[in-house]
Amino acid sequence: MNPELVLVVGDMFVPQRSPDIDEQFKTILIPNKLQHVLSLGNIGSRESYDWLKSLSNDFHTVKGDFDEGDISEKKVVQIGEFKIGMIHGHQVLPWGDLDALTTIQRELGWDILLSGHTHQIDIKVKDKKFYINPGSISGSFSYLIADPNPSFILMVLQGEEAIVYSYILNDKSQKFELSKIEFSKGANEYKIVKDEEENEEEEEEDEDKKEKSEKKEKEDKKNEIKEESNEESK
């Protein structure tokens, strides 16, 4: 079974609350490289809708609290062995509350529940079900947070295994913050995996500490020999 690459985005609000998606995101999100695109509503404009739809032949969206037209508020998508539920999230009170999300999940029996509305990226697990919020891909403001960092989720699904990449663009440094987790269908926990760059940095730090320790040992040995020599000369 081939892996399925799934983009999850929410709350674009382009151009109402944000002029556009950051160019760094657009260089990553190339048309026809993704098998599925799942949008959680509040896209903002026809142009934004068309851009998302151009990324994959399999595009799905749900109705946000600012969307108009005949769009479903709930949707289920089957990808591999995973039954994925989609809602915007304004139906959940308090917004983003895990217990409230769990109630919705139990009613519909989804393996993964995707929701937005808070504009803040979040991943949780409860009772062997996974809850993912991709944040706002444009970094548009919300009533909960005035200036969120732009973010989105990429999921790699293969059989009953999932890898979830969280992409966050730090507005101050203009650098990506990338995290990776792995989980299996029906598991009650997930594994946080450090990226290669972080591992390389830790290895460099360990090597630096080792060099400093060896240098200190040599200096201590020299001082010890020097003290012994001084004692003998007395």
Describe the predicted segments one by one.
Residues M1-L7, V76-G85, K126-Y131, L157-I163:
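Beta-strand-turn-beta hairpins that frame and shape the catalytic cleft
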Residues Q120-D127, E160-K234:
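A short C-terminal boundary segment appended to hydrolase-like catalytic domains
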Residues I21-Q24, W51-L55, K75-V77, A100-L101, ...:
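Short, glycine/charged-enriched secondary-structure capping and boundary segments
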Residues L7-G10, H36-N42, F59-G64, M86-H88, ...:
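Active-site neighborhood of phospho(di)ester-bond hydrolases with catalytic His/Asp-centered motifs
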Residues M1-D58, D67-E73, S151, S184-G186, ...:
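N-terminal active-site segment of His-dependent metallophosphoesterases
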Residues V14-R17, I43-S48, F66-E73, V92-W95, ...:
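Active-site environment of divalent metal-dependent phosphoester hydrolases
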Residues W95-E161:
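Conserved beta-sheet core of the metallophosphoesterase superfamily
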Residues D58-W110:
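Helix-adjacent hinge/juxtasegments
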